[in-house]
A protein has these predicted regions:
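N-terminal cationic and glycine-rich segments that engage phosphates or anionic surfaces
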Residues: 1-125, 130-141, 238-241
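Positively charged, low-complexity, intrinsically disordered RNA-binding extensions
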Residues: 139-242
Length: 242
């Protein structure tokens, strides 16, 4: 399959930055609480919870911490008030940015997100103004060093399970799926004992935009940094070709 992937540039992965600051477990804990509230504590019957558990393991969260989080959420369902919100906006030179957040105070989050755009000389847009520029895809990243299979064998497992595309990068493999097929592919890889660096449904830009103006780059980076530093922000997607 074609090696077209630019996954390192697709999404500023908040979890990588937050891991260094000790925040990732708190973020995942929120996601566990919401997933349990929406679909129950059994990951076999709760697609979202299974995704969060995969993310937790990829970030080295201990199994007992995951289990405690699930049990706590199951016994505290009525007090889980977090909700998902999405914002769309423009960075310098029209760079498209989509922000996913999980918050217990939408007014606070909206204010912080708006401020991040403004400080980087960007602006918030209306819902739907940019989402058509991205494709929603299941995306699984596999570390070559952690995987014992060769590329051909791994590709066949993924494609047989319903994957749309497979790409080999310098130090990793990427599997792309339709969102509806994501869980089938993830389970197929998991059953083969294949370690996944990340496994999630994400937004992939259809086209990328290159910035050459240093001021524009500085302003865009400011916006992205402010968004990633916000505890409510779960993911930031953009079409900047870094």
């Amino acid at each position: 399959m074609s090696g077209h992937s630019k996954f390192a540039n697709i999404k500023h992965k908040k979890e990588k930055n937050d891991a260094a600051k000790g925040k990732i477990f708190t973020i995942i804990g929120r996601e566990i609480a919401v997933a349990v509230k929406e679909g129950g504590p059994d990951p076999a019957n709760n697609f979202k919870l299974a995704q969060v558990i995969t993310k937790a393991k990829a970030n080295n969260m201990p199994n007992d911490t995951i289990e405690r989080g699930i049990k706590k959420a199951a016994g505290d369902v009525g007090n889980v008030n977090y909700e998902y919100v999405t914002y769309e906006g423009y960075g310098p030179n029209g760079i498209a940015i989509i922000v996913d957040a999980l918050t217990d105070n939408k007014n606070r989050t909206a204010s912080n997100v708006r401020s991040a755009f403004t400080k980087g000389q960007g602006s918030i847009g209306s819902m739907g103004c940019l989402s058509f520029m991205f494709d929603k895809k299941g995306q699984i990243i596999i570390d070559k060093e952690e995987c014992d299979m060769d590329a051909d064998e791994l590709m066949m497992i993924a494609l047989d399970a319903g994957a749309d595309d497979f790409a080999e990068e310098e130090d990793s493999f990427e599997v792309l799926t339709d969102p509806d097929a994501f869980e089938d592919v993830r389970k197929a890889l998991e059953e083969q004992g294949i370690p996944m660096m990340s496994a999630e449904v994400t937004m992939i830009p259809q086209n990328y935009v290159t910035l050459t103006d240093e001021t524009a780059i500085k302003n865009l980076q400011k916006t992205l940094d402010l968004l990633e530093d916000d505890d409510d922000v779960q993911a930031v997607y953009h079409n900047w070709d870094e």
